[in-house]
From Swiss-Prot:
Encoding gene, per UniProt annotation: Ppp4r3c1
Compositionally biased spans, kind Acidic residues: 777-788
Name of this chain's protein: Protein PPP4R3C1
Residue ranges, annotated region (Disordered): 730-813
Family affiliation: Belongs to the SMEK family.
GO cellular component, one term: nucleus
Gene3D superfamilies: Pleckstrin-homology domain (PH domain)/Phosphotyrosine-binding domain (PTB)
A GO molecular-function annotation: protein phosphatase regulator activity
Organism, as annotated: Mus musculus
SUPFAM superfamilies: ARM repeat, PH domain-like
Amino acid sequence: MTWPSEARPNINMEYRLHTVKVYVMMEDKQWKNVGTGQISSKYSEQLQGVCLLVHSLSDGSPIMECKIHPNVPYQKQQGKIIIWSEAKNHGMAIHFQEPNDCQEIWEDICQIQGKDPHVEITQELTDDLETFEHMPLIWNWVEMSNCEIHTLKNIAELFPFVFEMPSQKERLALFLENEGYIKKLLQLFHTCEKLKNMEGLYYLHNIIKGILFLNNTRLFNIMFSDEFFMDIVGCLEYDPALDQPKQYREFLTQNSKFKEVIPIIHSQLRQKIQQTYRMQYVHDIMLPTPSIFQTNLLSDITTMIFFNKINIITMIQEDENFLLEVFSQLKDNSIGDERRIELLLFLKEFCEFAKTLQSQKKNELLKTLIKLGIMSVLKVVVHMNDYQIQVGALDIFAYLVEYSPCLVRAYAMEEAQDSEDNDDLLINIMIKQMICDFDPEFSQGIIMTAVLHELLNPENMRTTAKGCERKVFLNFFYKRYMRKLIAPILSIRVKYDSNDNRVYICPDNYQNAQLLGAVLEILTFCVQYHSMYIKHYIFSNNLLRSILVLMSSKHTFLILCAVRFMRKIIGLKDKMYNHYIIKKNLFEPVVNAFMHNGHRYNMLNSAIIELFEFIRKENITSLIVNIVENFFRAFKSIEYVQTFKGLKTKYEEEKKRKSQRRKNLHSIMHPKMYYRHIEDMEVKVKADICCRGIIEEEERQGGGEEGAILPMGSDFTNNYDIFMKNKDTNESESAIEGQKIKSSEASECCPSHGDASATRMSRSHCSSLVPLVDYLYDTDDENDDDPYGNDKHEDEHEDEDEEPPPKRPNLST
């Protein structure tokens, strides 16, 4: 809806007075407050239009007289400010105390311009009016100078606009720093707290929080000083979003007291430690976790904390006696547990601060700590009955491994050279702490899992002057430490419940399941990153079978750990692993767990199906055959996935392929074996002919002697007939071959001399005529496995009638 602007508007000309502040934009685009007065709208004969008139509150003199132009853009902001510009770099602004007063004047302006009074801008602003976007700063900046309880609201409303203007942020930071403004605000805090003025306290919370988010190092130094810190904390207690104030000051004064474990000589070091603790407390505890859009709001405070920690570590290292005194007291058996806890907690915080150092500096620090005896101290204190000390010792050990795993590995191997007792080695002691952790949160186990991952990670192992660190340390680890690590798995016992026909493990409580899960996670890591070493260990200790026993646990997360371990092994597609799984029938516990899970569609169901699906996709033939032949009956009824039917299909395809391969091999080998028989017959017939000729010649020369064995006259003819018959047919091959062999043996070459020596000489003479026959397809090992993996017994039955004759010596003419 619009109103005609040509006609003179019908405006109520009653004398309406509203208190306002008037601002004018100067040539440098800075706003100047020209005074406070009362505003009214009335028709001016001189200006020929409706004007906005402001008269001073103090003396009634005119402060502003501006005609409402039909084509000038006016804008209303925050319900209390009206701004406009009549010329370039010339702006006007009026700030009302009450929104209703502002709305009355705004309706007059919209009526003159023919606009809807519900809009907040009458026309599009030009580039010259960009400064008006932040007009609320005008009123609030003026209120800043008047630090009073009644101005706290306007001061608090200033910060959201300042954060959008980097130039204004720096200006505000300078103002707060130079005017002693923080001190004035904290004086108001005491007043409001004494008067229990909750509204004022809420505004002060937002103001102090806004100052922190200015992210200015100079302001941080003021706010975290001894003079102001506790009052700053007090302001932050009154969060308007909470029903009750927090008790930060009570905690800091009663529970968190700064104590010098070792007297600090340097005052600068003491000041840095206190300031760092205060900043860390405010950053971590008192301020809410920033969103992804606010990650840089406190970047300067985190930077200050970072460099403060570096300075603290450096100053402590430069003090030669400080660390010496700490370790001498830790090694002293006469000190009490309370004192030992204090020293250990200091050492833990010292190591935590050292995380900020560069790698080279960390190595130097760790070498210094090892030289001072930190490892031997940890071995002693970790055996103490105080749980806080045990966790502290593990935390320190974790920091050292994180700083330089190479140095810790080197220390571990040097330590082992001087000790034959594996239980006395540092890493074994720490592993024992993990195994004996009775904390429901399993805190020590979590720490040691991360430590062992770091120590066993081959990516941070290097090649040293003494050789490859990976090979040396892993050999050492599997020899001296692995037995301790897998002890919880090997100690598991099983019991059979006849009522539900199931096997259960014991112990099977949640705490033990957590431990076993952590050990399995480490072993899975080993399978992935140093497979050769863990493979030997698995085979020699039958470790996979022991791990799969855990699939009878009542804790699903532990069963999943076991499945994940086996899945990692199968994922390697290693033939030795596959043979081991088949030989030990290790799919049985997996299938049992799957069947006991029933029709529940959960992580266990998905994990086991994924394992079998991987085998199917990768076509691991040996495993497919084992699964289908032994377990397909259990999977036959499963229809909601095609994995198991796919395994059956793969199995049938492989079986068909083997059968076809066997047929192809038979078609190639059968003719060659047949011609081999024919060649054998030819050689033997020639031998008969040779022997017959020699005998006939000897008979013509002198006749046969009594006692000589002469072949029958029909022997040659019979053998020749048999030979010719085999040329035409292959029927009754084995029987005929047997007759030939007997006939050949009977037809020995005999000389005409009757004595036995002469007979032996004739045999030798005949044998020397022909060398041994070398057949192309002969093999010396009759028990060799079929290269295609066929069943030997089945082949013997199938090829019984086609077995070739054994090799024999033969003669030729």
